[in-house]
């Protein structure tokens, strides 16, 4: 068995994830390498969900009965856990959403309806990058179409990194918001946050960071990032689906208008007007994802007990080993950084002339789960002249043996189509 420095005790960790014991085609054991799409859930999270539904299920806030008070305490307790996990200065800066896409749409719409000095209009500019997930492209396209603002973006270098050579021309005095991904979901690139934030601050632009591929894998400190907004999702970090987070600076959340209206987000309502509750409730209209938030709190407890630094070290070792092994496969081309340095735990590649969907299907027959397609990042595929990629992505329970299984599987793919 391959031994790598920095690995976690995956034998013990994998016992917490019941699904990893599944056997698929012809009794083949599941090799789950699709963690950038969603992670598997540990028993501790599953138990927390069952406990909530079996003992505490009620709608939150305003209720005076025992179940409502218990549900509210669990829901707001999850907010406290998120705030501590990302080192937020205040729990009131943590907004629960249904996913990162909703978080990013929330920012775009807040700015679209805002008063000065935050309002995006026809005289202002929005900056994104060519490596964004569609969830950090389409909301800004919609905002630009609605307001007349100009949408600009950073391009990509041949090795899958942001081209910041023209940063002063892209981010200008007209820029209202710069929104970019911390870790690319398709390229795996870890972006140079400090340089982008510094330039944005020079011109007085706001900064929004999509941390969906960062929060599950590395320590996330919103104060150190010096951003104005940070968005991420729960289902990629051992939490259930249906729960996301938007962190925003307190003074911004106080000044910016709500996007969705309804129950809970109000202070007073009359037939002629309404006033709004303080943040974060101003941005959480209607019944929130209570059970999902409880599950996210349990996921944070689980990850924190292991340690995000240790998870990062484990994944770096796995990614480094994967880059090495994949580089040995004939006709395989990694899309993105060719080394594990400044790279997250996802590797996209093409295998000769074999279509990625064919690669994925043959791998699936061997029990190996990868993701194929453009990964909701089609501009990246257009940039590199490819229709799609195969993506293998790793997490705290990934093992060197699974990388070996992937490489063996790819050899089988080559022989199958050879």
Show where each model-derived region lies:
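Pyridoxal 5′-phosphate
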Residues: 1-418
